[in-house]
């Protein structure tokens, strides 16, 4: 799942995965994460920002990828507080919903404990896709 502020390239990276690896794009802006007994699922939402993607389906979340634009592709795993800070900036906190903050923070804690978080400094090219697939999946898909 790609994370970052508006305009950083979340939809661009998703479109590269769609083009080169036939990946399904469920949303270009806001994804809900559900914790199940086996895994975490990313769900498409009707809030899609400027992208046209808003599928009512889910996909397993294998890793969190925090995007940065760069002249060359590189990736590194984040740890500790750096991981928390990088991901927290992309979380939608439901302050108005009774029990929503607690559920959100509990899910975030479980998510950050269970999944790797990477910072991907990248260009909008197939090389970024290859780098992520080697790092996250341990092989070329």
Residue ranges and their predicted role:
Residues 13-14:
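Post-Walker A alpha-helix
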């Amino acid at each position: 799942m790609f994370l970052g502020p508006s305009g950083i390239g979340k939809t661009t990276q998703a479109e590269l995965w769609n083009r080169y690896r036939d990946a399904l794009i469920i949303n270009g802006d806001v994804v809900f994460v559900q914790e199940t007994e086996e895994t975490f699922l990313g769900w498409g939402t009707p809030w899609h920002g400027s992208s046209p993607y808003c599928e009512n389906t889910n996909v397993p979340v294998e890793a969190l990828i925090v995007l940065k634009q760069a002249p060359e592709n590189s990736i590194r795993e984040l740890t500790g507080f750096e991981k928390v800070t990088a991901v927290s900036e992309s979380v939608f906190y439901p302050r108005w919903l009774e029990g929503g903050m607690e559920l959100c923070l509990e899910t975030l804690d479980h998510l950050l404990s269970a999944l790797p978080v990477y910072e991907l400094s990248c260009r909008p090219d197939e090389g970024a896709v290859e780098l992520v697939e080697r790092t996250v999946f341990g092989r070329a898909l």
